[in-house]
Each structure stands twice: as C-alpha cells, then as structure tokens.
C-alpha cells in the first residue's frame, strides 16, 4: 500500500495565521536572543535552517485558507496551538470541530499555570498541553520541579504533553531540552503521556531507547521535512515502534505542506506503518 492520500491523516502541528506578518509569533523568545542576525534579520529565529518559509499572503478568512491547504493535501484533522485571546482559533474550533483541535502552550514560570490548564480544558476542550522549555525566559529544564504541577494536571485530565526536545533551532541554549532529562520525568510520572517534538537530535538513538523503556513516551515529526526524518526514528517505526511515531508538520511556521507531502512519499516506512504514523496513533492517543 505505502503512502497514499486516502489514509486518514492528522497533522499534530499546524498554525492558523491571523495576519500576513507573523513575526509576533516569536516575541516571547526575544529576551533569549543575543546575535544580531536572530534579533533583526530573521523572519523567525531559526530561519537559517529553513530556506523557503511559507508566505501565506493576506486573506479575509484565514480559517478557510488553512482548511484549503489541509484539503489540498488530504489532511483530515489538525492540532493548533490555542490562545484564549485569538478569535480566529476559537471560531475555528467552534465552526469546524471535526477538523481542528487544540493544544495549550504553557510556561511553568506563569503563576497558577496548572489551574489555568484545567480552566481552559473545561471551557474550550483542549486535547493536549505543549511547551518549548528552551524558548521560555527564564528557561526551565524538562525535569525541573517547576513542571510538576503541570505534569500532575496533565495526568489528572488525561492530556498528552507535547514537548520540544533536542537541540533547538533558534540560537538559544539547548540544556533544558536534553533528551536524557525525559528519563526522570517518565520515571516519576508513569501515567504522563509525553510526546517529543522537534527532532530530539542529536540524541535520536536515546529517544528510541527511552520509547522502548516507557510505554507512555511518543515522538512526533514536527519541524522536520520528511527527507530529513532521522534514520533512527524511521527504523524504530519500522521495527518495534510503529505505535509510537506520529506525523506532525510545521506549516506555516517553517515548512509548506506542498514541500512536506512532496517528500512524504519517499520516506521508507513499511506498508503497515503508514496508517499508524499518519493518523491512527494520534487518534488513539488524543481520543479523536
């Protein structure tokens, strides 16, 4: 069978723009940026890694624009970062609940963040929680005790925790996202469903070893074009980990869906891996 457009597909990282200029998506990172190129020349802080950042243009209805891109590439559902002040995202979830669902970006430096997760969950029905440990100021390592109330709330509400791991693309310190730190978190919170984001490089072999060790540890392919999927991850999916690896894109932050799906068909997944990777694993984990 291999890759084909008829496989149910869930994109675990897709953005809905609200205007053509998306530079305000990255203001949270400004206190960490020190080199002039990152501060003043890039459209986004990891632009040196992404040659063709999508230009979305201006649209009267960005939700319809996002749906059009999804339909073009046969994406059935997409997970979008939720912001309570965003009318666009609230309307997307309200008007198209069969197409969009949400993760809530969190920061343990924010007072009462765990209580806020519960409030947003009860009011808006988020499906997951997400974080960028190296991108927050001050940075907070994955295994720092500051995360414990958030991890506990994720367990209480049965919400998966999606976390950037490995060397971050922006020129900021990597220490908070070392893959080895996940070991302590999964040990201390065995019921926490932890999903790695953004590569886990250069520690992909360790990421696979930890996924074998912990039943609730997963990996999503966000921010990587398919031709650059780590070999360790592809091999793991084809052997002992087909229920652990899930598709996530990076549109429009750094990759176009045209590029992703043009390259996707060349990923050497086994036939029985494709449905799991593209949608079935996400449906099961997130109860879609």
Give the predicted meaning of each segment.
Residues 1-12, 19-68, 72, 77, ...:
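Mid-to-C-terminal alpha-helical segments outside catalytic/metal-binding sites
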Residues 68-76, 96, 156-157, 188-192:
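A structural motif corresponding to the C-terminal end of an alpha-helix
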Residues 9, 78, 100-102, 161, ...:
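Hydrophobic/aromatic residues located in beta-strands of well-ordered beta-sheets
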Residues 17-19, 85-88, 109-112, 136-137, ...:
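Active-site environment of divalent metal-dependent phosphoester hydrolases
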Residues 127-128, 141-246:
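Catalytic pocket-lining loop regions of alpha/beta-barrel enzymes
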Residues 59-68, 110-121, 204:
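Short, acidic/polar
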Residues 76-77, 83-169, 176:
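Active-site gating/metal-coordination segments in enzymes
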